[in-house]
């Protein structure tokens, strides 16, 4: 057989071949010997020998892909080591794939290129020979000059960095994977460090092991660890080119006991073929553990000024916290000369050291080391005794010259407690030089008694009591312990009579007692609380509003239109009384055209009120006239300031204060009753729509009896005489008022309003009711803020509830016994509601609208805790103040939605400027209520301001038709007759009693007698007042027209007001 030629024959005989994607192609190589192939991807080959002796090898690809792109070479197997150019035949096959424009690399680290500053190859080969390829530097995003060969890639000299090839095929841009050119190959060797964040862990913790390698940039890492079979670890790589190091991190989440073992990291330098392995032990415990080995005994002693150390070894995981106590007080609060330290011996072992730098006597005591580890806590204790030499603090004669004997007290101290011995010397002249003259004192003889005790400073007081002394003698006190022995002497003079000293002492004692008594009386008088109105009008004196002054209420004008004839006011039962005054239920006649008889609340001072308190009440009246009317404040209706005590007449709120209401309805809130299917629909004020045309905007007087407010309740048997109205003319039978509103046209959402603002209190209490209360209070406070008025005592006890579930803000401090009210804390000569006050009010005496916002947040807490006391279980002391300063805030009440609690927390912001305004608060609450609530509220408020409510008419009317009482022009009287007022009669057998100034309440029994003899009482009262010309004593047959005429006659009498308070 002839020797084969130098190279076989490859068919087809082309340099390159383009094969469409997913089509088949075949290459054939024939020669005179056995043939081998070098192909980019393994493909099946078929070899056969024909009759002529030629070897024919065929490779076939059924579905071509981009991975088949590359050189296909055939050669004689025996010539594999010969020159490639002569021994091989080759063809380059392209398989264009639009989804794979660049041929993927199959060689490990094929995208890593070593920079040797010679021509390099970045093998970003394309699958489509028509592609236009540009090399881009990723770091600069700039093209890199190079020569590109579609069969080899980008050719050139490249600096270290990251590169990418951009190919454009048919107008579309494609990018290859990143190619990394390494500029450093590493030092002379390979260095590996293996560390772990924690080598001891608990089940569930995360194991983190770091393997830091320094060598070339082409390194391989290989890990061995207990959980490798389960492939539990996560590996990450971070390259630090600046320091020429690579960090490999192995992370095992949710470690278990099975992850305990050896963790091994092996690093191989691909360039130098060097490798290095490091190991570390990791231990995972199933649970926490802790043990203490004290290096001291239960009892220890130290000498004075000695440096002492007491050690205890602690084994714990996780890390334990160690605290030392002395006599149950943390050592950090005892002295700076006692130090504690904690030394870490290993990840689970520590040494705690207690050091007494210079032991002192007060360092004696019980020392306790408490070690806490999670839920585990253990303690070890030692009792330390610092030995102190015995000393005599004092030696004194207490009863020198007493006729009943003399007493000598020797005060000693030392550790251990000194032993005290007594000696006497009767020969005074030789006591100093002759030790034999001193003899021990017999214990508890007939002439001498001894006693000893420890005083508050833990000193030992030893007392010797001598009977009658005939001669002067010297007494020695000797104190000794194991550290020292000391003695002191004192001379006792024999007993003798000294009557002049006795008399002088008695006079001196009496004088001291008198002086002390006077001082106590003065202090008590100065500390007696004085009445002051909490509401204040402020005026800003700085551009930013941070500085302000209080406007003196006495400088505000008083409009005499508010004056109401005293004889038109009948006082009834006492609603509440306090340290300064009282609030009395009253009936006013002629306040309004639509309600000629109206139940009101009357504020007055006690008869013993000082002039400053009268001035304060007048200030309150002027502030209320300054504010004007609003739906959600207790409005001023009138005042009596002339010819008698000052009376402030306000709206009467039947359901009392909000706290009591929430308490009484707590059960209905917690256990709501099922709705009755046949319940009548009510409008938002609880008025039957069928009767709406005959009812006023809001009923201001009631015949039934209810609690009024949470204050010191007066004796129920005490009454101020009040007009009796017969059963035939009760309030419920009176005709409708003249400020009726037209019947409402109810929509589909009014059912929600029925429950929110219904007057049917049996319906129960809902979360929407609570939101309604908070919204109305916010609107009321928004109104006060618009008037520059600061409330300073905003709380649920100062919010009253009237018909239709309308809440009204008030200040009933006058009639509240604040000296015995736990909500008020004594500070100087006043009592403050500290738990409702903002920090700047408590600590800086700063009151603004923003401090009222803080109080509003406390009010929200009260409402949604259903009348709970703020900061439950906490007393107002230094600890309370410190907690407020440090940012303590109350947790969310049980019934508060999260949105409401978020609003509370905003109100309690320690920085006042960051608290919300009352306008913002009302908008926020409105968003939590049914959509139609705000519309209903605005309609009611509009009707209130358009009505002839007394609080509105006195502000709006400034013409001749204004009325005081019922003072109408003739056309007004005609109009009253036409509307049926002349049909309203008072009972013929009911007397009208003119109230005496500051008349003491009467008992129920006396009140009943007066009712039975009303006519007689009326006459007597009229005589006592001395005002027969203005007495409104209604006779049988009198009509309201007659009452009106009397009013007009008396109108001129009401122009004078006490000038001293105006």
UniProtKB/Swiss-Prot annotation:
Region (Disordered): 734-754, 975-1034
Keywords assigned by UniProt, alphabetized: ATP-binding, Cell membrane, Chemotaxis, Developmental protein, Disulfide bond, Glycoprotein, Immunoglobulin domain, Kinase, Membrane, Nucleotide-binding, Phosphoprotein, Receptor, Repeat, Signal, Transferase, Transmembrane, Transmembrane helix, Tyrosine-protein kinase, Ubl conjugation
Enzyme class: transferase
Location of Phosphotyrosine modifications: 548, 550, 697, 708, 719, 731, 739, 824, 963, 992
Composition-biased stretches (Basic and acidic residues): 975-986
Localisation: Cell membrane
Subcellular location, principal: membrane
UniProt entry tagged with the keyword Transferase: yes
Gene3D superfamilies associated with the record: Immunoglobulins, Phosphorylase Kinase, domain 1, Transferase(Phosphotransferase) domain 1
Transmembrane stretches, start-end: 505-525
Ranges in the topological domain labelled Cytoplasmic: 526-1062
Polar residues: compositionally biased ranges: 1014-1032
Mechanisms controlling activity: Present in an inactive conformation in the absence of bound ligand. Binding of pdgfa and/or pdgfb leads to dimerization and activation by autophosphorylation on tyrosine residues.
Sequence ranges assigned to domain Protein kinase in this UniProt record: 569-945
A GO molecular function held by the record: platelet-derived growth factor binding
Reported modifications of this chain: Ubiquitinated, leading to its degradation. Autophosphorylated on tyrosine residues upon ligand binding. Autophosphorylation occurs in trans, i.e. one subunit of the dimeric receptor phosphorylates tyrosine residues on the other subunit.
Residues carrying sugar: 79, 132, 273, 333, 366, 433, 444
Family (UniProt): Belongs to the protein kinase superfamily. Tyr protein kinase family. CSF-1/PDGF receptor subfamily.
Function: Tyrosine-protein kinase that acts as a cell-surface receptor for pdgfa, pdgfb and pdgfc and plays an essential role in the regulation of embryonic development, cell proliferation, survival and chemotaxis. Depending on the context, promotes or inhibits cell proliferation and cell migration. Plays an important role in the differentiation of bone marrow-derived mesenchymal stem cells. Required for normal skeleton development. Required for normal development of the gastrointestinal tract. Plays a role in cell migration and chemotaxis in wound healing.
Protein name as it appears in the record: Platelet-derived growth factor receptor alpha
Gene source species: Takifugu rubripes
């Amino acid at each position: 057989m002839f020797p084969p030629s130098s190279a076989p024959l490859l068919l087809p005989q082309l340099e390159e071949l383009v094969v469409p994607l997913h089509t088949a192609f075949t290459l054939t190589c024939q020669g005179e010997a056995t043939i081998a192939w070098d192909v980019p991807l393994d493909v099946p080959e078929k070899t056969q020998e024909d009759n002529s002796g030629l070897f024919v090898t065929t490779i076939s690809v059924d579905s071509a892909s981009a991975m088949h792109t590359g050189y296909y070479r055939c050669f004689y197997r025996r010539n594999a080591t010969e020159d490639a150019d002569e021994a091989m035949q080759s063809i380059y096959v392209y398989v264009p794939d639009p989804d794979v424009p660049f041929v993927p690399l199959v060689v490990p680290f094929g995208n890593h290129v070593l920079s040797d500053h010679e021509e390099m190859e970045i093998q970003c080969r394309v699958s489509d020979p028509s592609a236009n390829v540009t090399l881009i530097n990723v770091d600069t995003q700039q093209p890199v000059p190079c020569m590109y060969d579609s069969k080899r890639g980008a050719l050139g000299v490249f600096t270290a960095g990251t590169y990418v090839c951009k190919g454009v095929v048919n107008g579309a841009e494609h990018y290859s994977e990143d190619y990394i050119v390494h500029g450093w190959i590493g030092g002379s060797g390979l260095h590996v460090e293996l560390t772990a964040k924690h080598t001891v862990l608990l089940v569930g913790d995360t194991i983190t092991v770091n393997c830091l390698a320094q060598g070339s940039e082409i390194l391989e890492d290989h890990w061995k660890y207990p959980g490798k079979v389960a492939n539990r670890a996560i590996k990450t790589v971070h390259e630090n080119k600046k320091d020429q190091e690579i960090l490999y991190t192995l992370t095992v989440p949710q470690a278990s006991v099975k992850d305990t073992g050896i963790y091994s990291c092996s690093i191989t330098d691909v360039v130098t073929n060097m490798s290095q392995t490091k190991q570390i032990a990791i231990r995972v415990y199933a649970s926490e553990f802790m043990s203490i080995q004290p290096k001291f005994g239960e009892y220890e002693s130290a000498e004075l000024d000695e440096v002492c150390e007491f050690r205890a070894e602690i084994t714990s995981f996780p890390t334990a916290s160690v605290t030392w106590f002395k006599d149950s007080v943390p050592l950090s609060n005892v002295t700076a000369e006692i130090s504690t330290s904690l030394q870490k011996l290993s990840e689970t072992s520590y040494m705690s050291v207690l050091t007494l730098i210079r032991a002192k006597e007060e360092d004696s005591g019980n020392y306790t080391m408490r070690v806490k580890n999670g839920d585990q806590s253990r303690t070890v204790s030692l009792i330390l005794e610092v030995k102190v030499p015995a000393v005599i603090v004092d030696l004194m004669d207490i009863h020198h010259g007493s006729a009943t004997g003399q007493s000598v007290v020797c005060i000693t101290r030392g550790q251990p407690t000194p032993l005290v011995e007594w000696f006497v010397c009767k020969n005074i002249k030789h006591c100093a030089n002759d030790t034999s003259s001193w003899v021990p004192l017999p214990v508890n003889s007939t002439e001498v008694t001894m006693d000893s005790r420890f005083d508050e400073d833990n000193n030992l007081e030893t007392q010797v009591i001598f009977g009658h002394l005939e001669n002067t003698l010297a007494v020695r006190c000797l104190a000794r312990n194991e550290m020292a022995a000391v003695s002191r002497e004192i001379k006792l003079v024999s007993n003798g009579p000294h009557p002049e000293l006795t008399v002088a002492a008695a006079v001196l004692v009496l004088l001291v007692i008198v002086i002390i008594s006077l001082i106590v009386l003065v202090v008590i008088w100065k500390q007696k609380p004085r009445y002051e109105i909490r509401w204040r009008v402020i005026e800003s004196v700085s551009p930013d509003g941070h500085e302000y002054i209080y406007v003196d209420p006495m400088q505000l004008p008083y409009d005499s239109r508010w004056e109401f004839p005293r004889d038109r006011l009948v006082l009834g039962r006492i609603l509440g009384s306090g340290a300064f005054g009282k609030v009395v239920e009253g009936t006013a006649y002629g306040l309004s055209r639509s309600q000629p008889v109206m139940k009101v609340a009357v504020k007055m001072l006690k008869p013993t009120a000082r002039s400053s308190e009268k001035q304060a009440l007048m200030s309150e009246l002027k502030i209320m006239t300054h504010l004007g009317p609003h739906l959600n404040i207790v409005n001023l209706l009138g005042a009596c300031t002339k010819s008698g005590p000052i009376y402030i007449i306000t709206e009467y709120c039947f359901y009392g204060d909000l706290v009591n209401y929430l308490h009484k309805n707590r059960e209905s809130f917690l256990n709501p009753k099922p709705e009755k299917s046949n319940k009548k629909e009510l409008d938002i004020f609880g008025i039957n729509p069928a009767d709406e045309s005959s009812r006023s905007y809001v009923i201001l007087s009631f015949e039934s009896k209810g609690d009024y407010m949470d204050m010191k309740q007066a004796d129920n048997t005490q009454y101020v005489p009040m007009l009796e109205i017969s059963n035939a003319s009760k309030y419920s039978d009176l005709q409708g008022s003249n400020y009726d509103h037209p019947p409402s046209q109810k929509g589909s959402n009014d059912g929600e309003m029925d429950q929110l603002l219904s007057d049917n209190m049996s319906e129960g209490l809902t979360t929407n009711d609570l939101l309604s209360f908070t919204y109305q209070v916010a609107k009321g406070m928004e109104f006060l803020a618009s008037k520059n008025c600061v409330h300073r005592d905003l709380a649920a006890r100062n919010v009253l509830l009237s018909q239709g579930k309308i809440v009204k803000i008030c200040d009933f401090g006058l009639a509240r016994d604040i000296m015995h009210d736990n909500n008020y804390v004594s500070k100087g000569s006043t009592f403050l509601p500290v738990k409702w006050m903002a920090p700047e009010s408590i600590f800086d005496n700063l009151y603004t609208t923003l401090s009222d916002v803080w109080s509003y947040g406390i009010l929200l807490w009260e409402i949604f805790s259903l009348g709970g006391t703020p900061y439950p279980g906490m007393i107002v002391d230094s600890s309370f103040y410190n907690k407020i300063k440090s940012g303590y805030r109350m947790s969310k009440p049980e019934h508060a939605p999260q949105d409401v609690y978020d609003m509370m927390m905003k109100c309690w912001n320690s920085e006042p400027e960051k608290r919300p305004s009352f306008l913002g608060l009302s908008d926020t609450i409105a968003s939590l209520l049914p959509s139609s609530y705000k519309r209903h509220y605005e309609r009611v408020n509009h009707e209130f301001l358009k009505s002839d409510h007394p609080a509105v008419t006195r502000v709006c009317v400034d013409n001749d038709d204004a009325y005081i009482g019922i003072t109408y022009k003739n056309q007004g009287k005609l109009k009253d007759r036409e509307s049926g007022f002349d049909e309203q009669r008072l009972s013929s057998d009911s007397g009208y009693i003119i109230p005496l100034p500051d008349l003491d309440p009467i008992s129920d029994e006396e009140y009943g007698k007066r009712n039975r003899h009303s006519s007689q009482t009326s006459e007597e009262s009229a005589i006592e007042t001395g005002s027969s010309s203005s007495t409104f004593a209604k006779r049988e047959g009198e009509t309201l027209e007659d009452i009106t005429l009397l009013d007009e006659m008396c109108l001129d009498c009401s122009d004078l007001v006490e000038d001293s308070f105006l």
